[in-house]
Swiss-Prot record:
Residues 63-141 are annotated as: Domain II. The keyword DNA repair applies. It comes from Bacillus cereus (strain ATCC 14579 / DSM 31 / CCUG 7414 / JCM 2152 / NBRC 15305 / NCIMB 9373 / NCTC 2599 / NRRL B-3711). Residues 153-205 are annotated as: Domain III. SMART domains: HhH1. InterPro entries: DNA_helicase_Holl-junc_RuvA_I, Hlx-hairpin-Hlx_DNA-bd_motif, NA-bd_OB-fold, RuvA, RuvA_2-like, RuvA_C, RuvA_C_sf. Homotetramer. Forms an RuvA(8)-RuvB(12)-Holliday junction (HJ) complex. HJ DNA is sandwiched between 2 RuvA tetramers; dsDNA enters through RuvA and exits via RuvB. An RuvB hexamer assembles on each DNA strand where it exits the tetramer. Each RuvB hexamer is contacted by two RuvA subunits (via domain III) on 2 adjacent RuvB subunits; this complex drives branch migration. In the full resolvosome a probable DNA-RuvA(4)-RuvB(12)-RuvC(2) complex forms which resolves the HJ. It is found in: Cytoplasm. GO terms for molecular function: ATP binding; four-way junction DNA binding; four-way junction helicase activity. GO terms for cellular component: cytoplasm; Holliday junction helicase complex; Holliday junction resolvase complex. NCBIfam families: ruvA (TIGR00084). GO terms for biological process: DNA recombination; DNA repair; SOS response. Residues 1-62 are annotated as: Domain I. This is Holliday junction branch migration complex subunit RuvA.
Length: 205
């Protein structure tokens, strides 16, 4: 129904943002609302209008590719909007695609609500069908196994750090806030934890 919404970020919450467009506030659920910052500059959010008997909601994404992966995930049995958002909340779109293409169940089951059965279903339903989702930086992932193994290693260290944060009592929304910053660097598990704690304690988003 809506391709995108352009406007000003009026509110940022744990689950959604409100975009003000011509005096109308659009409540848009996003994978990580904290990647959007309140400002006087207009932004564009690519949207997906989800309608079912018991729910009608707008879901928003920073790129068309992210939205496309969301819609493909919705087509997998056992994954609903909340589950799809949780998968995308890490900001690791390319690595999710890599995991599916290389049948890496261990990576996929680390997402909230994804068990072994759902991970296998994701691979069965989506493997070989995600080339149009992959950003330019990952155009050769389907043939470059060595690069995948290297990225999977650093991803494992980040995953361990995120699990440690959860074990320390940080809520999922707090963990999601710092993921974009952590993804900018390649660190050891301990270094990821120290940096994440610094970001959380300083309130940086």
């Amino acid at each position: 129904m809506f391709e995108y919404v352009t406007g000003y970020v009026e509110y940022v919450g744990p689950e959604y943002v409100v975009i003000d467009h011509n005096g109308i506030g659009y409540q848009i659920f996003t994978p990580n609302p904290y990647v959007f910052q309140r400002s006087k500059q207009e932004i564009r959010v690519y949207t997906y209008h989800y309608v079912r008997e018991d729910i009608m909601a707008l879901y928003g994404f920073k790129t068309r590719e992210e939205r496309l992966l969301f819609t493909k995930l919705l087509g997998v049995s056992g994954i609903g909007p909340k589950g799809a958002l949780a998968i995308l909340a890490s900001g690791q779109t390319g690595q999710v695609v890599q995991a599916i293409e290389h049948e890496d169940e261990k990576f996929l089951v680390k997402f909230p609500g994804v068990g072994k059965k759902t991970a296998r279903q994701m691979i069965l339903d989506l493997k070989g069908k995600l080339a149009d989702v992959v950003p330019d930086a990952f155009v050769d992932l389907f043939s470059d196994t060595e690069r995948f193994d290297e990225k999977k290693g650093s991803s494992a260290e980040l995953d361990e750090a995120l699990e440690a944060l959860r074990a320390l009592g940080y809520a999922e929304r707090e963990v999601s806030r710092v993921v974009p910053e952590l993804l900018k660097e390649s660190l050891t598990t301990d270094q990821y934890i120290k940096k994440a704690l610094s970001l959380l304690l300083n309130g940086k988003r």
